[in-house]
Amino acid sequence: MHTIREKSKLLARVRRIRGQVEAAERALETEKGCAEVLHLIAAARGAINSLMVEVLEDHIRMHVVDPAKERDNERAQGAEELIDAVRSYLR
């Protein structure tokens, strides 16, 4: 599995996300205002989307085509465009 080389980095991100979700849970339990709860949820969602982008980009580079190593310029450009599209959609 290619994510093993980044395992500690990915796990740290997941743990931060867990902390954000737990903060949202505490805010709901203590009946904080809607704006605060929404802010906490939005932060967790952003963190999850960023994690998704990182894992998808790694997957594309490791299992589909690595634009930096691809000799076929059209495939390399297509891979870069796919990575850019994923980034812009999920951020």
Regions found by a protein language model. Name each.
Residues M1-R91:
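Solvent-exposed interaction patches of small proteins and small membrane subunits
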